[in-house]
Each structure stands twice: as C-alpha cells, then as structure tokens.
Amino acid sequence: MPELPEVETVCRGLEKLIIGKKISSIEIRYPKMIKTDLEEFQRELPSQIIESMGRRGKYLLFYLTDKVLISHLRMEGKYFYYPDQGPERKHAHVFFHFEDGGTLVYEDVRKFGTMELLVPDLLDVYFISKKLGPEPSEQDFDLQVFQSALAKSKKPIKSHLLDQTLVAGLGNIYVDEVLWRAQVHPARPSQTLTAEEATAIHDQTIAVLGQAVEKGGSTIRTYTNAFGEDGSMQDFHQVYDKTGQECVRCGTIIEKIQLGGRGTHFCPNCQRRD
C-alpha cells in the first residue's frame, strides 16, 4: 500500500511529466472510483490545465486551473503517463487525455482508489473533516501536541499511529520501522509511553519517512513510481517482512503478530511489552 514516501515519489514524478498540460477529455471506466458528483467530474475536467502537484498525508493533489483533484491510491493505485497513445491494459480505469496527444492513465488492480474534485477553498475543510494529523516534518509535527494526544489514549501505539490523527502518512510498513528504531512494542497502550519513548517515536517518524522519500519509497510487491521504476527503501528495512530473521541490533529472532488486523513485525528483546 502506498504510504507517504511512495505518494510523494509519485507526486515528484508527475511534476516532471504533466505540469502545464491541458486536459482535452476524460474517460472513466470504473465510475465508483469518483466520490464526488460524476457528471460534474466529467464536465469540469476538460479544459482544465494541470498547474501544479501536491501531497497531503497519503493524498495526491492535482492543482488545476480552478479546481483541485484529490486522488487516494489506497492499496494498488498507480499513474502512468504515455506521450502518445497508451496501450490497452486490463486494470486501467481512468484516462486523462491531453491536448498535446499524451495520456495520463490511472491503474488499480484492487479498484480501491478514489478521486474527488473540489474547489481549492474547500481543501482545508476537507482535510479537517478527515481528522488528518500534521505532516511528519520538524516544522509541522509538534512534539508537545503529540505527547498530549498519546497521554489521552488507551489505543495500542501502532493502531494510534496508523489512524492518521497523530501524524499523517504512516502505514503498516513504516510504523513497524519507526517503532523498531524507537524500541517501543507496537501493542503498548499510547498513554503508557514515557516522554523519552514518545520523543523517540516522534523523531524516528520524521527520520524514517524522510529517508524513505530520499530512497524513492519501498517496492514490496507492486509499487512503482510514475516512471515505472521501483523504490529502494525496502533494502533499508530493519524489521518489516523480516519474520524469522535475526534483529540486526541484538540478534533476537524477529516475530510477527496480528495487531488490529494488521501483520506486525517487531523484536521481542529490543521492543519489550512491559
């Protein structure tokens, strides 16, 4: 599933491929992906110019002439740009045709991805309604606010980090990596964390996601960037998908449990429950 680093990588790729292009027509083969009014979506997009790209958490943002297209890739969503006629592909569901003859294609094997069209003035309200936390940066991710939110919750720290309210952009892969680096057990109730542990999680969230952006994201199964290239962050994972291997820090065998319905990897020695 694309998490913040993967979405940021897609965003940066699309910036190089489609900025300034004018949409001539749109073709939607799976209408359920469009979560705002379908007729308005089809009517408003032609003649819009893609002015810039952006990202908020795991949401990809297309800033158009007077609209914003919000795209969530969910589990398997991908964008591919074809300068000429694109090939017929089984899992291609939305086609943005440009005046210069190019086409941007949205592909999604699972069909879980979503698209919404808003006026820019409603963007802040949209993300407030999603209860989306701050971006994982030094400027936006306030440690004291984070500690205060943890102190009020009995949720397991992994589940809490995944719900996007504490900080935006973490998913299953990077939560496991952050908690391993911070040496915190994923099932620990949030309110039991010490100030030192909360600080470690805060700092490692910024560090891990920053490193993952630098490495172009993680390719575990099918993720590729807008150029069809794999990321390399998977080569730097220390715990995710390492079940049965030795912890590089202490030599203990990495274990996998189910937590909140999610496969969860941790070191039982470095990340003690009590």
From Swiss-Prot:
Its cofactor is Zn(2+). Transmembrane segments: none annotated. Binds 1 zinc ion per subunit. A zinc finger (FPG-type) spans 238-272. One of its GO terms (molecular function) is zinc ion binding. Involved in base excision repair of DNA damaged by oxidation or by mutagenic agents. Acts as a DNA glycosylase that recognizes and removes damaged bases. Has a preference for oxidized purines, such as 7,8-dihydro-8-oxoguanine (8-oxoG). Has AP (apurinic/apyrimidinic) lyase activity and introduces nicks in the DNA strand. Cleaves the DNA backbone by beta-delta elimination to generate a single-strand break at the site of the removed base with both 3'- and 5'-phosphates. The gene is mutM. It catalyses: Hydrolysis of DNA containing ring-opened 7-methylguanine residues, releasing 2,6-diamino-4-hydroxy-5-(N-methyl)formamidopyrimidine; 2'-deoxyribonucleotide-(2'-deoxyribose 5'-phosphate)-2'-deoxyribonucleotide-DNA = a 3'-end 2'-deoxyribonucleotide-(2,3-dehydro-2,3-deoxyribose 5'-phosphate)-DNA + a 5'-end 5'-phospho-2'-deoxyribonucleoside-DNA + H(+). PROSITE patterns: FPG_CAT, ZF_FPG_1, ZF_FPG_2. InterPro entries: DNA_glyclase/AP_lyase_DNA-bd, DNA_glyclase_Znf_dom_DNA_BS, Formamido-pyr_DNA_Glyclase, FPG_cat, MutM-like_N-ter, Ribosomal_uS13-like_H2TH, Znf_DNA_glyclase/AP_lyase, Znf_FPG/IleRS. Gene3D superfamilies: 1.10.8.50, MutM-like, N-terminal. The active site is at residues 2-3, 58, 262. NCBIfam families: fpg, PRK01103.1. This is Formamidopyrimidine-DNA glycosylase. DNA binds at residues 91, 110. GO terms for biological process: base-excision repair. Its EC number is 3.2.2.23, 4.2.99.18. Belongs to the FPG family. PANTHER family: FORMAMIDOPYRIMIDINE-DNA GLYCOSYLASE. The keyword Lyase applies. SUPFAM superfamilies: Glucocorticoid receptor-like (DNA-binding domain), N-terminal domain of MutM-like DNA repair proteins, S13-like H2TH domain. Keywords: DNA damage, DNA repair, DNA-binding, Glycosidase, Hydrolase, Lyase, Metal-binding, Multifunctional enzyme, Zinc, Zinc-finger. Monomer. It comes from Streptococcus pneumoniae serotype 4 (strain ATCC BAA-334 / TIGR4).
